[in-house]
Curated annotation (Swiss-Prot):
One of its GO terms (cellular component) is respiratory chain complex I. Core subunit of the mitochondrial membrane respiratory chain NADH dehydrogenase (Complex I) which catalyzes electron transfer from NADH through the respiratory chain, using ubiquinone as an electron acceptor. Part of the enzyme membrane arm which is embedded in the lipid bilayer and involved in proton translocation. It comes from Gadus morhua (Atlantic cod). Its EC number is 7.1.1.2. This is NADH-ubiquinone oxidoreductase chain 4L. The lineage of its organism: Eukaryota, Metazoa, Chordata, Craniata, Vertebrata. Belongs to the complex I subunit 4L family. GO terms for molecular function: NADH dehydrogenase (ubiquinone) activity. It comes from the Eukaryota. One of its GO terms (biological process) is ATP synthesis coupled electron transport. PANTHER family: NADH-UBIQUINONE OXIDOREDUCTASE CHAIN 4L, NADH-UBIQUINONE OXIDOREDUCTASE SUBUNIT ND4L. Its main location: mitochondrion. Gene3D superfamilies: 1.10.287.3510. It catalyses: a ubiquinone + NADH + 5 H(+)(in) = a ubiquinol + NAD(+) + 4 H(+)(out).
């Protein structure tokens, strides 16, 4: 395993572990999701550069656009949750408590 592959895999796994273990605030979950998407974006960009294929060069930009849409939807949910519940704790999002 090359150092580049190790770094990208480590970044993705750290984001996944953060998402699994630190689920108290919605903002921290969104940041962990963004870290995972950034690791995937870098991996896909390096993969398309390694192959020298022009057809694969649009995939990282498409994934970056989807990541930006995911971030904006997540922040909109964060604002809506903070306005209705007064907090961004994940326990406030339980449907049985609403």
């Amino acid at each position: 395993m090359t150092p580049t592959h190790f770094t990208i895999s480590s970044a993705f796994l750290l984001g996944m572990m953060g998402l699994a273990f630190h689920r108290t605030h919605l903002l921290s979950a969104l940041l962990c999701l963004e870290a995972m998407m950034l690791a995937l974006f870098i991996a896909l960009s390096l993969w398309s550069l390694q192959l020298d294929a022009t057809g694969c060069s649009t995939a990282p930009m498409l994934m970056l656009a989807f990541s930006a849409c995911e971030a904006s939807a997540g922040l909109a949910l964060l604002v809506a949750t903070a306005r209705t519940h007064g907090t961004d704790h994940m326990q406030a999002l339980n449907l049985l408590q609403c």
